[in-house]
UniProtKB/Swiss-Prot annotation:
It comes from Drosophila virilis. The gene is mRRF2. GO terms for biological process: mitochondrial translation; ribosome disassembly. Belongs to the TRAFAC class translation factor GTPase superfamily. Classic translation factor GTPase family. EF-G/EF-2 subfamily. This is Ribosome-releasing factor 2, mitochondrial. It comes from the Eukaryota.
Length: 712
């Protein structure tokens, strides 16, 4: 039990210290690469990571996902299912550089793991399945990397397979991701039929030896004149593409008046600059399972991805050295002590005495610090940083007033955006004696995985879990048993509906109460309107503007917090109320009235408005991609039609398969994976992810309400 709690704490306490000169040793930081590896499920992320560890000398044997002996997939559930659930950190050396790598999940249910990991990296490798190209989750993780402004390179995996099409992957990168791929390699078939690789920059052919698990490979000059001519044309295209985005290379091309006179070193330097500036994406290829091309991917990480010094910063850089036993202060105002510092290798930890800025480490002893918090050594340091940042913002805005109680959290925390839950279910301990242990375990799991929602339903007295999907819930239940020895019972899954108001409404609420001899008094006028952009606004009409301008920022903040908080639970099925704007018209707060009383009054006023306006249900819609043999498509489409699905497109997928693009209500997809296997006799595969919410017709809404109330 103690080990499980420690392990969970270690996994959720990863952090990255960053700094620029003159505060750190720049030479040390220049030798570091902090990278993440992202992909759609089953594209080969973990296999690629295992090969990197093996060739770097970190492991003595090749880990295989299907054998359940990989380093980075160490949870029991990961090895049983052959999928990555938790991000894993590993560190290894390659050609004089220290690479800190985070292997992330590919399944949509664990997208929060990806989001948290991206705060701790400076660049990413995106792995594509050479037989499938850009897939649904590829688009999702690419967008996440865009949001974090992360430079990236692409590794096209599984190129040894006969149905792999490199050109299609390049076309997908352009069409589906709006990327500018630079092909530094091209596929080559050797005489024996095995995959080889052409290096476009050096005009060489690379061949991997299979008798030593791909540890060595040969580099051969091209002999065929046709091969040389074709590859030189590709090299010229590469230089032409790069010179269009890199002025230094363009000047060299103009001065030499020849692509052939541009050296390999200049190309690599230009490609590095363009990659770090996110103007282009280098593309490499290989086969992780067949041990082909991985060393060159590691070379590309060193050559093209940025150091911590070159990483785009959100605010001014902060730095220093973290030492064992050091006392730190988080931006939440919590004083903490770093008890131990570790260098990670998945679930194995090597204790170190300190860690310098720019590196990645695992930290034990931080009880309240979470991903995204700023750590300083004193209140003075925090205040100085706060003042410098406020000066660079609009200091006149109430949101950034220095006296606000949450200014540290709002300005200095870079907490990831937590996706909305799509499923809910009740959770019960096996006995009352294990209730406290279950609650503590859920707190640990929630700290590690913020997409897990844990709420207490005051009406039913039950603890309610919210998650990203059926698999997410299954994994939570399994981990509670395997790591915390608590065999919980989960209730039936409930759909996470949302609600929207039927008609606009306005009301005034007056609340007066005597609490412990202190008179509390609030008079507030609020209005609810349909609005998809602005959640809270002030009425600037002449009759109200003077009243609202006289409000202290602190009062406005607690009013806003209370009003918005009331939208979290609608009157129909307790769903979040969306597409709704709260407009504050007028408010009067009596002298000495507590903030909590003002907040409660605002929430009560919004609840009154929701009852007055009425709400309608919005149901979650899933975007699905189904790959099935041609002869099975008609049966699959017929079944989807019965599930209220919208067939968006059916297109060829190779010679024998079709790709079906579908939008379907989540409520109709319970157990669909099993149904699809039955309809297709196990020959079809499917992926799905949330794509928004849609209004329901009256009959479906009535049925949903009855189900939510346990009447059906």
């Amino acid at each position: 039990m103690q080990y499980s709690l420690l392990s969970a704490q270690l996994r959720c306490s990863r952090f990255l210290l960053r700094q620029q000169a003159p505060f750190i040793n720049r030479c040390y930081s220049d030798d570091i690469r902090n990278i993440g590896i992202l992909a759609h499920i089953d594209a080969g992320k973990t296999t690629t990571t295992e090969r990197m560890l093996y060739y770097a000398g970190k492991t003595r044997s090749l880990g295989e996902v299907h054998r359940g002996n990989t380093v980075t997939d160490y949870l029991t559930q990961e090895r049983e299912r052959g999928i990555t659930i938790c991000s894993s950190a590993v560190t290894f050396a390659w050609n004089g550089k220290r690479i800190n790598l985070l292997d992330t999940p590919g399944h949509i249910d664990f997208t929060m793991e990806v989001e948290q990991s991206l705060y701790a990296v400076d660049g990413v490798i995106v792995v594509l399945d050479g037989t499938a190209g850009v897939e649904a989750q590829t688009v999702t993780v690419w967008t996440q990397a865009d949001n974090h402004r992360l430079p990236r390179l692409v590794f096209v995996n599984k190129m040894d397979r006969s149905d792999a099409i490199f050109d299609k992957c390049i076309d997908d990168l352009k069409a589906k991701l709006d990327a500018k791929p630079i092909c530094t390699q091209l596929p080559a078939k050797n005489v024996d039929g095995q995959l080889g690789i052409y290096d476009v920059i050096t005009l060489e052919q690379l061949t991997w030896q299979q008798n030593d698990f791909g540890r060595t490979y040969s580099i051969n000059k091209l002999e065929s004149s046709s091969e040389i001519r074709e590859l030189r044309e590709k090299r010229n295209e590469l230089i032409d593409q790069l010179s269009g985005v890199d002025d230094e290379l363009a000047e060299v091309v103009i001065s030499t008046e020849s692509f052939d006179k541009v050296s390999n070193e200049l190309i690599v330097q230009a490609l590095r600059r363009a990659t770090c500036q996110q103007k282009v994406v280098p593309v490499l290829l290989g086969s992780a399972y067949k041990n082909i091309g991985i060393q060159r991917v590691m070379d590309a990480v060193n050559a093209y991805l940025p150091t911590p010094n070159e990483r785009n910063q959100i605010y001014n850089c902060f730095g220093g050295e973290l030492k064992r036993g050091m006392r730190v202060l988080s931006s939440r105002g919590q004083a903490e002590v770093i008890s131990k510092i570790y260098e990670p290798l998945a679930d194995e930890y090597r204790e170190v005495s300190s860690v310098r800025a720019g590196d990645v480490a695992i930290c034990a002893g931080l009880k309240s610090t979470v991903t995204g918090d700023l750590l300083t050594t004193s209140h003075t340091s925090l205040k100085n940083a706060q003042k410098r940042l406020i000066q660079s913002l609009d200091a006149t805005s109430p949101q950034y007033d220095e006296d606000e109680v949450d200014v540290n959290q709002e300005l200095f925390s870079i907490e990831p955006k937590i996706p909305d839950a799509v499923y809910f279910c009740s959770i019960e301990p096996p006995s009352l004696s294990t209730q406290t242990a279950m609650e503590q375990a859920l707190k640990q799991l929630q700290r590690e995985d913020p997409s897990l929602r844990v709420n207490y339903d005051t009406v039913t007295g039950q603890t309610v879990l919210g998650g990203m999907g059926e698999l997410h819930m299954e994994i939570i239940k399994s981990r509670l048993l395997s790591e915390y020895k608590i065999d919980v019972d989960l209730g039936p899954l409930q759909i996470a509906y949302k609600e929207a108001i039927e008609t606009p409404a306005i009301t005034t609420l007056s609340v007066e109460k005597d609490i412990a001899g202190s008179k509390q008094n609030v008079n507030i006028t609020l209005q609810l309107t349909n609005n998809q952009t602005e959640l809270f606004s002030l009425d600037k009409s002449p009759e109200n503007v003077q009243n609202l301008n006289a409000l202290r920022p602190r009062v406005l903040q607690v009013l806003r917090k209370g009003a918005i908080g009331a939208l979290e639970r609608g009157p129909r099925v307790g769903g979040q109320v969306v597409d709704t704007q709260i407009r504050l018209h007028n408010v009067t707060v009596g002298r000495g009235t507590a903030d909590s009383f003002v907040m409660a009054a605002a929430a009560q006023c919004v609840q009154k408005l929701l009852s007055k306006s009425g709400t309608r249900l919005l149901e979650p819609i899933m975007a699905m991609q189904i790959v099935a043999p041609n002869e099975r498509v008609s049966g699959i489409i017929a079944d989807l039609s019965r599930r209220r699905a919208l067939i968006k497109d059916v297109m060829p997928k190779g010679d024998r398969n079709k790709l079906i693009l579908v939008n379907a209500p989540l409520a109709e997809l319970s157990g669909y994976s099993s149904a699809l296997r039955t309809i297709s006799s196990g020959t079809a595969s499917m992926t799905m992810q949330p794509c928004g919410f849609s209004e329901m017709n009256a009959a479906d809404e009535t049925l949903a309400v009855r189900r939510a109330q346990g009447l059906d």
